[in-house]
From Swiss-Prot:
Cofactor (UniProt): FAD
InterPro entries: DHS-like_NAD/FAD-binding_dom, ETF_a/b_N, ETF_a/FixB, ETF_alpha_N, ETF_asu_C, ETF_asu_C_CS, Rossmann-like_a/b/a_fold
Quaternary structure, from the entry: Heterodimer of an alpha and a beta subunit.
Keyword tags: Electron transport, FAD, Flavoprotein, Transport
Official protein name in the record: Electron transfer flavoprotein subunit alpha
GO biological process: fatty acid beta-oxidation using acyl-CoA dehydrogenase
Pfam family, one: ETF_alpha
GO terms of molecular function: electron transfer activity; flavin adenine dinucleotide binding
Homology family: Belongs to the ETF alpha-subunit/FixB family.
Entry note: cofactor: Binds 1 FAD per dimer.
């Protein structure tokens, strides 16, 4: 039994989500191969070869794969994937984009966002915004799976010495083109990789008030997130959204400020190791999942906390 893991990367560096996905592959059992598809990805392939538990790295270096356009990447993965028992990818924007197409090309059902491996054909995944866990069994010859990375502890990034093999695949399908992207520059950690996250909700009242969270986050070395209510209100951009329809995080410390705790938000952060809630409404649902709660006006509490840090 061999498992193909699709590497998450930016053509320059291997993303941490790949390490969690390899951990899921190890739980399944079998030889683990990693596919690095992109442009000028030698450094990524080198990093993937060092990952604990990986026995082979497949490298598809082609301009057609540079931006992970699903119309180009999916046929490549499907062509390679038919020789494996499992194809795994992190449940990231890219993974959620191309892997359903891979499943369709292989004529199998996809299993989405697993958080536990029961056996090589049986997996657990959250449903109902994380309020229930479904056990799913697949009889497909090739099991196509996205992995919720917060469900698996990352394997070591060093210690492996996998063989590296060049592969080729279908060229540019010509069905879509990459136009451009705007990258937000920040000295703060990336939201899904941060060990500490400070998030604000509707209680922040406006975007300008997020500056008190930024001040606290900078002292803690934390990333800053937001609830959907704050994003929908235009307080902050949607790349800061934590929740079922945003980013899934599981930091060592999650500080929820002015967040009521709708189930959609809880689905994105309830696996955090320690949850601290600050809200003036003592009946707010967020207190039901918080390890520590402070019933207070956030505009008094957060500046005091920032001064004390």
């Amino acid at each position: 039994m061999a498992i193909l893991v699709i590497a998450e990367h930016n053509n320059a560096a291997l993303a941490a989500a790949t390490l969690n996905t390899v951990a899921a592959a190890k739980a399944i059992g079998g030889d683990i191969h990693v596919l690095v598809a992109g442009q000028n990805v030698a450094a990524v392939a080198e990093a993937a070869a060092k990952v604990e538990g990986v026995s082979k790295v497949l490298v598809a270096d082609n301009a057609a794969y540079a931006h992970q356009l699903p119309e180009n990447v999916a046929p490549l993965i499907a062509e390679l994937g038919k020789n494996y028992s499992h194809v795994l990818a992190p449940a990231t924007t890219n993974g959620k984009n191309f892997l359903p197409r891979v499943a369709a090309l292989l004529d199998v059902d996809q299993i989405s966002e697993i958080v536990e491996v029961v056996s090589p054909d049986t997996f657990k995944r959250p449903i109902y915004a994380g309020n229930a866990i479904a056990t799913v069994q697949s009889s497909a010859a090739v099991k196509v799976i996205t992995v919720r990375t917060t469900g698996f502890d990352a394997v070591a990034a060093e210690g492996g010495s996998a063989a590296v093999e060049q592969v080729s695949g279908p060229a540019d399908a010509g069905k879509s083109a990459f136009v451009g992207e705007e990258l937000a520059k920040s000295d703060r950690p990336e939201l899904t990789a941060a060990k500490i996250v400070v998030s604000g909700g509707r209680g922040m009242q406006n975007g300008d008030n997020f500056k008190i969270l930024y001040a606290l986050a900078d002292k803690l070395g934390a990333a800053v997130g937001a609830s959907r209510a704050a994003v929908d209100a235009g307080f902050v951009p949607n790349d800061m959204q934590v929740g079922q329809t945003g980013k899934i995080v599981a930091p060592q410390l999650y500080i929820a400020v002015g967040i009521s705790g709708a189930i959609q938000h809880l689905a994105g952060m309830k696996d955090s190791k320690v949850i601290v809630a600050i809200n003036k409404d003592e009946e707010a649902p967020i207190f039901q999942v918080a390890d520590y709660g402070l019933v207070a006006d956030l505009f008094d509490a957060v500046p005091e906390l920032e001064k004390a840090v």
